[in-house]
Amino acid sequence: MAAAKPENLSLVVHGPGDLRLENYPIPEPGPNXVLLKMHSVGICGSDVHYWQHGRIGNFVVKKPMVLGHEASGTXVKVGSLVTHLKPGDRXAXEPGA
């Protein structure tokens, strides 16, 4: 019997007031990507807007969306073209920076 693929428990907004905990498969990093083992993830004001209103300004949640985009973790795998991080390095992610 094949081993089950590892999964990541995620907080997903489906629409205004509709939050669900769902498992998502853990992806393999692409050549320029890094896979982090998450230590903490913040839920910020934009996430609250998506949950309460299903939107922020012109951006409307039209399909399920994983919340939380301010995070810290440890690199477990790095893509073949990544030169600035290695497995074991601690990192923080902030997509707006």
UniProtKB/Swiss-Prot annotation:
Annotated InterPro entries: ADH-like_N, ADH_Zn_CS, GroES-like_sf
Catalytic activity: xylitol + NAD(+) = D-xylulose + NADH + H(+); L-iditol + NAD(+) = keto-L-sorbose + NADH + H(+); keto-D-fructose + NADH + H(+) = D-sorbitol + NAD(+)
Cofactor: Zn(2+)
Main subcellular localisation: mitochondrion
Keyword presence, Mitochondrion: yes
GO cellular component: mitochondrial membrane; motile cilium
Protein location: Mitochondrion membrane; Cell projection, Cilium, Flagellum
GO biological process, one term: flagellated sperm motility
Enzyme class: oxidoreductase
Binding site for substrate: Y50
Gene3D superfamilies assigned to the protein according to its UniProt record, in alphabetical order: Medium-chain alcohol dehydrogenases, catalytic domain (3.90.180.10)
EC number, as in UniProt: 1.1.1.-, 1.1.1.14, 1.1.1.9
Keyword Membrane: yes
Alphabetized SUPFAM superfamilies for the sequence: GroES-like
Membrane topology term: Peripheral membrane protein
Molecular function GO labels: D-xylulose reductase activity; L-iditol 2-dehydrogenase (NAD+) activity; zinc ion binding
Residues that coordinate or bind Zn(2+): C44, H69, E70
Entry note: cofactor: Binds 1 zinc ion per subunit.
Keyword terms: Cell projection, Cilium, Flagellum, Membrane, Metal-binding, Mitochondrion, NAD, Oxidoreductase, Zinc
Biological function: Polyol dehydrogenase that catalyzes the reversible NAD(+)-dependent oxidation of various sugar alcohols. Is active with xylitol, L-iditol and D-sorbitol (D-glucitol) as substrates, leading to the C2-oxidized products D-xylulose, L-sorbose and D-fructose, respectively. Is a key enzyme in the polyol pathway that interconverts glucose and fructose via sorbitol, which constitutes an important alternate route for glucose metabolism. May play a role in sperm motility by using sorbitol as an alternative energy source for sperm motility.
PANTHER family hit by this protein: SORBITOL DEHYDROGENASE
Assembly with partners or alone: Homotetramer.
Family statement: Belongs to the zinc-containing alcohol dehydrogenase family.
Protein name from the UniProt record: Sorbitol dehydrogenase
Biological source species: Sus scrofa (Pig)
